Amino acid sequence: MPSLSLSKLLRVGEGRMVKRLKHIAEHVESLSPDVEGLTDEQLKAKTTEFRERYAAGETLDELLPEAFSVAREASWRVIDQKHFHVQIMGGAALHFGNVAEMKTGEGKTLTCVLPAYLNAIAGDGVHVVTVNDYLAKRDSEWMGRVHRALGLETSVILSGMTPAERRVAYAADITYGTNNEFGFDYLRDNMTHSLDDLVQRGHAFAIVDEVDSILIDEARTPLIISGPADGSSKWYSEFARIAPLLKKDVHYEVDIRKRTIGVHEAGVELVEDQLGIDNLYEAANSPLVSYLNNAIKAKELYTKDKDYIVRDGEVIIVDEFTGRVLVGRRYNEGMHQAIEAKEKVEIKAENQTLATITLQNYFRLYDKLSGMTGTAETEAAELHQTYTLGVIPIPTNRPMVRVDNGDLIYKTEEAKFDAVVDDVVERHENGQPVLIGTTSVERSEYLSKQFTKRGVAHNVLNAKFHEKEATIIAEAGRSGAVTVATNMAGRGTDVVLGGNPDIIADIALRKKGLDPVTTPDEYEAAWDAVLDEVKAEVKADAEKVRDAGGLYVLGTERHESRRIDNQLRGRSGRQGDPGESRFYLSLGDELMRRFNGSALESIMTRLNLPDDVPIEAKMVSKAIKSAQTQVEQQNFEIRKNVLKYDEVMNQQRTVIYKERRQILEGEDMEGQVEQMITDVVTAYVDGATAEGYVEDWDLEQLWTALKTLYPVGIDHKTLAGEDGAGINSDLSRDDLRTALLEDAHAAYKKREAEIDAIAGENGMRELERRVFLSVLDRKWREHLYEMDYLKEGIGLRAMAQRDPLVEYQREGYDMFIGMLDGLKEESVGFLFNLQVEAAPAQPASGISVTAGSAAAASATAPKPLPTQEAAARTTGTAAPTALRAKGLDDEGPSRLTYTGPDEDGKAKATRDSAADSGDGAASRRERREAARTQSKSNRAPKSKRKR
């Protein structure tokens, strides 16, 4: 981690902040007598009063003492829990935008109620972020009981929910969910084509539970939404069939040295004849050009058993320098698929990034960010550097009396586990509950078999079934209980001595068919009686457990992160209870092997110690701590590197998403279109007149290029004054530019009148919005693809003594500017040349898009029907008559892949459930039909078409 001096520096003023929080807590507690005298209805009415006062100008800071006091009283009445002094301090720390470091068992979930309630008063929505769906659902239901009693709505975002359900959930005052769900919803919102389809309503305030896990461990893996880069594998097969019919130097030419190909006129005609289309280069068929080029490259430039081999039905690349096969590597831009088609093996879909963001940059979107954890002190410097979050250690409610024993190190893993089993059996017989932490599922199952052999009843948790694990962890503090769990399992649930009465009571009520969401009144009515009954049961057992020494936590291996070890230890000794912890290690453990375990082994061998005799030495503990620090430093560097590269993308993403949102919100695009026309026509003219005098300019070629952009209304011969005597040499570049700009703007006015005649008033404005969205999305997807490609190879720049990051920033910027120029050019071309016709009125938007449309196959987010809430948010302006616009991207749903971190911080990919309603690249017959009905002027090319 960053240097100790920085960590110490960050803690300057910490004591002052803790004192301030103590004063706030005392003030809140002093208001208790006032709120205790209020009826339930009067307590609920306080929320409306606070909102009125906030609207009148009072700040949330000024409302804090009263609001906290009201929420505290509601918690006591509804769930029989009242915030301790230290929990009020923690709540205030969260409100002020800090990380509250509260030890395990100090009630972080209850603490969160206070700042969530206070900030919900502002009406902008509060997001509470947890590590898994189960905890999000549980906390939403559990703490939602308190918020509902105060007149607030709570909701939860779960994987598998529809966009309509998500929209309703985000409209609630307080929304619970996982970091992945919040992040993916943000990305999907920036892929949608209608305001009605947006689900989130801003990023005002977030409270991140287990902040170290989410903002540190999981931040190494970015969130990525990807989809098929091309529509269908059938086009690869089709062109693999056509390629052998094409003859070198007759239909195409090849430059072996540059590894490029060029298709001749004869080749284009043969392809058009084979596909039954009129023009390969018009908009309907433009995606087919890349299929053709790749098929010829696969035939001429990629040789079997030299550039690649085919093994077990799979095309595998061969490294041209070493001759080694590169398993898992694939060529980009559809080249690998073209080779697969050539070799007649299975064609695997190419996935393309459609949207991506790191967790660091997602959480930086929030106006105010805060978090809770039991172990943040070791990461204080990183939290401050990345998120400008301060870490405030909150005192424990009662003094910690847990005994943390020194590590025991064994020579072999087998000897270690034998000692673990012996220790657990002895404590189990004494009635002491034991929680055993392992680092893998295999080790959990191995221990389970050993306990079964010894006749010890036990439970095994592997962090897969969260609902089941909460139940088991809730009972892990009962007399004689033995629980084996991976280190990450059971987070968010307290191990209470004698059993967790709240969880046990909740389970009992659910067995009777009652829950706090679907049957809130019946649940609340039955709650007190069931809770009292359970408390009486666990009280006697809790005393037996205390007499036996409290919960014994046994770690079977050190984790590479000190925080994970501390979290495991922290399960014992909550709220001043007695407890004990110890780690059993062996020289075969991963951390020991990685960091000089051999030196320790030689010492143990020289001492001639038997395998089953451990050593306990401070030297070993120090070495382990040093090893953990090194691993943490490595992981910090990885996260820092991910963030540095994403900063480049983040600036570009911010520009694109801002522009996109303005288009969605109905900003008048007329002025922007006029500027685009000016920029594009100027670029055409400047390119054609860059060199020489008027006699040297190829005005014929310029006019040909301009005619593909818009219907040119003036003749270049007339403008240049050409006659029998030659060209008028007085024509300047400025005169030419001015004349063409006047002509282009006049043509656009005429075009606007045509569209308005079909669609009515504002029809052109709606068409502009649809065209801009379609082209912007496609260009952005292509840009992400190119940026991915750039990043893959940028590390090689270091060999040329260049900083890869600086090179990535420079080239990424150049590519972004190029993308924006292409965006203008294509948009202008589409606006002038799109074929439009009247269509049946659409309920959601003014212009519909034909299926099997001509642009490149697109992958966009599933488009739900607007809910009533979304409908209420729409502007209500009269939509123009519906138009059918040929050549725009189809907005149909595509199967998307979502890649994000799991609870261990490793990348995990999931697929959505969108129906495959049609192929992005239509069938051959459909393509032919679309092509025949398509105008040759649909395409918006960059320059004169070259064959």
UniProtKB/Swiss-Prot annotation:
Highest taxon of the lineage: Bacteria
Residue spans of biased composition, Low complexity class: 870-885
GO cellular component, one term: cell envelope Sec protein transport complex
Enzyme category, top tier: translocase
Ranges of compositional bias, category Basic and acidic residues: 903-914, 922-931
Record keywords: ATP-binding, Cell membrane, Cytoplasm, Membrane, Nucleotide-binding, Protein transport, Translocase, Translocation, Transport
Cited Pfam families: P-loop_SecA (PF21090), SecA_DEAD (PF07517), SecA_PP_bind (PF01043), SecA_SW (PF07516)
Annotated positions binding ATP: 87, 105-109, 494
Membrane topology note: Peripheral membrane protein
Catalytic reactions on record: ATP + H2O + cellular proteinSide 1 = ADP + phosphate + cellular proteinSide 2
Disordered: region residues: 860-947
CDD domains hit by this protein: DEXDc_SecA, SF2_C_secA
UniProt xrefs under Gene3D superfamilies: Helical scaffold and wing domains of SecA (1.10.3060.10), P-loop containing nucleotide triphosphate hydrolases (3.40.50.300), SecA, preprotein cross-linking domain (3.90.1440.10)
Biological process annotations from GO: intracellular protein transmembrane transport; protein import; protein targeting; protein transport by the Sec complex
Coiled coil is among the record's keywords: no
EC number: 7.4.2.8
InterPro entries found in the cross-reference section: Helicase_ATP-bd, P-loop_NTPase, SecA, SecA_DEAD, SecA_motor_DEAD, SecA_preprotein_X-link_dom, SecA_SF2_C, SecA_Wing/Scaffold
Subcellular location: Cell membrane; Cytoplasm
NCBIfam families in the cross-refs: PRK12904.1 (NF009538), secA (TIGR00963)
Assembly and oligomerization: Monomer and homodimer. Part of the essential Sec protein translocation apparatus which comprises SecA, SecYEG and auxiliary proteins SecDF. Other proteins may also be involved.
Role, per record: Part of the Sec protein translocase complex. Interacts with the SecYEG preprotein conducting channel. Has a central role in coupling the hydrolysis of ATP to the transfer of proteins into and across the cell membrane, serving as an ATP-driven molecular motor driving the stepwise translocation of polypeptide chains across the membrane.
Family the entry assigns: Belongs to the SecA family.
Protein name, entry field: Protein translocase subunit SecA
Source organism of the structure: Rhodococcus erythropolis (strain PR4 / NBRC 100887)
Gene designation: secA
